[in-house]
Amino acid sequence: MHSLLTQNNNINIIPIKAFKDNYIWLIQEKLNGIIVDPGDAKPVLTKLEKETINLKAILITHKHHDHIGGIEELINNYPNVKIYGPENNQFGFKYQIVKEGDAITVSGTKVKFNIIETPGHTLDHIVYVDKEHLFCGDTLFACGCGKLFEGTHDEMYKSLLKISSLAPNTKVYCGHEYTKENIKFALSIDADNYELNERCRRLQDVEITIPSLLQEELETNPFLRVRNSEEFKLIRKRKDEF
């Protein structure tokens, strides 16, 4: 079972639940905090105030409202917060555009991330990765992947290949709690997969299933187990109709 708090090298990673199934991620280093994809400001403000955490930065993976809807209110409460995100003219606030190959260091912390562009779910989608953690928004889910609202199947397949090449012990922090439904679909097309069946059994009574390890995604996630773009397209369409 994964705990509600992931501790590593004096950095805590804490899930903040929002809406029906969203995860907003708080990366805490001492009394400094970084928020990933704050779709709703209220639970974030409650957590920051309760723990007396100073919000240093906001990381945006993509433009959907359930990932950015709380940003303006957070700016009102923390006017000096630094915001990073993909290039998008629709954002109504100032932020630093980051692209593939960029690296960011959050001021006042030791937190550093590299940027990878992952078009598919949306064309502007990016992910943030360091040696041990991946914040992937709606590109990769536990045992699943994001729906294609803008990108092509080939674009999404190539985006997932980028993620697949990361270290197997990378912890994967996605934007939604879809794991159990995703496992049901995975079992419908890969019923004899021992690791997948074990994952299903292990998570039956677990409420928060994130983070997962990239290694277990490589073993059980049908969208990372395909051999080419055409296979990905076929399975993605089957999932859309599941």
Per-region residue spans from a language model:
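Active-site metal-binding motif and surrounding structural segment of the metallo-beta-lactamase
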Residues: 41-85
